[in-house]
Amino acid sequence: MELVYEGKAKRVYKHGDFYIMEFKDEVTAGDGAVKAQAPGKGALTAELSALLFKYLSRVVETHFVEYKPPNALAVIPAEVIPVEVIVRFKAYGSQLRRMPRLRELQHLSRPLVEFHYKDDALHDPLVYPQEVVEAGLAAPQEVEAIEEMAVRAASALRDLYARAGCDFIDVKFEFGRRGGRLILVDEVSGDTFRLLCRGEHLDKEYFRKTKDVNGLIERYRDLLQITKETFTRI
């Protein structure tokens, strides 16, 4: 297989008509400023992403094809749009620094959608939807469609984890183009969303705050188990 891309958390290989997305046993924080080996993390995030992509396929089109145990997904190649789309249901993280009058975990009256330009050196700056259009990254109708798809997918995840009594705070998505259509790409895991279960983070926020790799792996195992158990009740 030909390596076509390597990022902080994944390697992507070309394999026939598909790409193989291999998840690393590494965890990073602060746009890669903090990095640690995390044995078993790749398999946990790959399996969880596979489950959640299957679940989300009922509400949005995705690049997911199949799970390749233990730590990879087969996906459809797509032209990735260099914008991260964050959907927030509760105030948290960088939003509190921008608007300190919000309380941590304050419920937002409706989902708040943010666009961030993907650039680690610039720390993925917040940008306006019009700037995405003016920069030629997406057409106006694509920006509208991306926002609608992101809210639909995020709401589906919130509803899924609500069944387990968990509090879905926010999620980061990426989108791409395939045959003139917009599709959800990248991954959906504890690396890309924040989830509180019984008041405890089962996501990468735990590592950001503690730098405890073993504790993160325990929480990712719990997250995968909760997700599987919740699926049996759908």
UniProtKB/Swiss-Prot annotation:
UniProt keyword annotations, A-Z: ATP-binding, Ligase, Nucleotide-binding, Purine biosynthesis
InterPro entries, alphabetized: SAICAR_synt/ADE2_N, SAICAR_synt_PurC, SAICAR_synthetase, SAICAR_synthetase_CS
EC primary class: ligase
Domain of life: Archaea
Enzyme Commission (EC) number: 6.3.2.6
Reaction equation(s) it catalyzes: 5-amino-1-(5-phospho-D-ribosyl)imidazole-4-carboxylate + L-aspartate + ATP = (2S)-2-[5-amino-1-(5-phospho-beta-D-ribosyl)imidazole-4-carboxamido]succinate + ADP + phosphate + 2 H(+)
Molecular function GO labels: ATP binding; phosphoribosylaminoimidazolesuccinocarboxamide synthase activity
Any one of the GO BP annotations: cobalamin biosynthetic process
Pathway: Purine metabolism; IMP biosynthesis via de novo pathway; 5-amino-1-(5-phospho-D-ribosyl)imidazole-4-carboxamide from 5-amino-1-(5-phospho-D-ribosyl)imidazole-4-carboxylate: step 1/2
PANTHER family on file: MULTIFUNCTIONAL PROTEIN ADE2, SI:DKEY-6E2.2
Family to which the UniProt record says this protein belongs: Belongs to the SAICAR synthetase family.
UniProt name for this protein: Phosphoribosylaminoimidazole-succinocarboxamide synthase
Taxonomic lineage: Archaea, Thermoproteota, Thermoprotei, Thermoproteales, Thermoproteaceae
Gene: purC
